[in-house]
């Protein structure tokens, strides 16, 4: 992570700003978070902004700092960009005349993000299963943006796809491109039918009762935000392979993801 404008950067890892310098006019590494904030008109943070509700997300815990520390360093007239910003942080920042822009509030970013997420989820499935996706029976839990993107790409790989959702509109849309659609409450009854299960729902529908019915050769790819939608302790006890795959866009399509964030940030800066 770099907190920067076009002049200063605070790197979360040594030499982490070298690649940034290729794309902006001047980049100077700041010796501290305070120094970076003082000399920056805009502060750019990651998506998610925080994973535990207390600290800004960083790759290395050595460089951890709290969101409250950052909040107290922001000054009136600055802009802060991040994804999934807690409402309390937004409120306090606004009271201090700091403009806050949340990636999650943009209409287009979640759509682009879902594409990278879907491709990453499928990559994880290919990497961790000895079976082809081709002609395999796959379950996708949820049919929001990420669920839709996963289903669309699985069908492109000739997989047999069933969608589980309790939303009537989602169920109707799923029936257009998926092979079958079921209510989420029926997941336990059908869990043993699938070789791959992709979860996008941020609630624990894949509980111990459901896991007992999952085939031992199946693979569960869970992309739901923490703590995820799987009872991981039960999965381990039962010998079920379940992976909690977060940050897939940054892992599998960092350049594309960064480009979309850059466009979002620039659009807000030009308007302000």
Briefly describe each language-model feature range.
Residues 50-52, 65-74, 174-250:
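Rossmann-like adenosine-cofactor binding region
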Residues 153-154:
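Aromatic pocket-lining residues of Rossmann-like dinucleotide-binding sites
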Residues 1-6:
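Conserved small/polar residues in nucleotide/adenosyl-binding loops
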Residues 7-23, 157-177:
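NAD(P)-binding Rossmann-fold cofactor-contacting core
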Residues 45-135, 245, 264:
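Glycine/serine-rich phosphate-binding loop and adjoining beta1-alpha1 elements at the start
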Residues 146:
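Hydrophobic/small residue at the entry helix of a nucleotide-binding pocket
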Residues 25-34, 180-186:
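Short acidic-hydrophobic, aromatic-tinged amphipathic segments that line or gate anion-handling sites
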Residues 84-101, 223-270:
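Rossmann-fold NAD(P)-binding glycine/threonine-rich loop
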């Amino acid at each position: 992570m770099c907190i920067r404008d076009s002049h200063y950067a605070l790197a979360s890892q040594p030499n982490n700003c070298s690649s940034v310098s290729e794309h902006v006019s001047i980049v100077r590494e700041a010796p501290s978070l305070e120094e970076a904030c003082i000399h920056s008109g805009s502060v750019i943070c990651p998506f998610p902004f925080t994973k535990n509700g207390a600290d800004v997300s960083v790759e290395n815990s050595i460089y951890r700092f709290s969101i409250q520390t950052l909040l107290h360093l922001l000054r009136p007239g600055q802009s802060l960009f991040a994804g999934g910003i807690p409402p309390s942080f937004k409120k306090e920042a606004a009271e201090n005349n700091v403009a806050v822009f949340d990636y999650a509030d943009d209409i287009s970013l979640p759509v682009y993000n879902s594409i990278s997420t879907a491709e990453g989820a499928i990559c994880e499935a290919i990497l961790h299963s000895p079976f082809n996706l081709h002609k395999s029976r796959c379950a996708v839990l949820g049919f929001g943006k990420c669920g839709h993107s996963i289903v669309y790409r699985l069908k492109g790989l000739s997989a047999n796809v069933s969608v589980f959702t309790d939303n009537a509109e989602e169920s109707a849309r799923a029936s257009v491109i998926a092979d079958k659609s079921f209510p989420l409450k029926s997941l336990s009854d059908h869990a043993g039918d699938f070789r791959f299960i992709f979860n996008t729902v941020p609630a624990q529908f894949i509980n111990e009762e459901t896991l007992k019915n999952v085939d031992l050769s199946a693979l569960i790819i869970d992309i739901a935000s923490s703590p995820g939608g799987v009872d991981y302790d039960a999965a381990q006890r039962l010998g079920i392979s379940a992976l909690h795959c977060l940050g897939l866009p940054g892992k599998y399509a960092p350049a594309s993801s960064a480009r979309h964030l850059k466009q979002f940030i620039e659009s807000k800066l030009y308007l302000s």
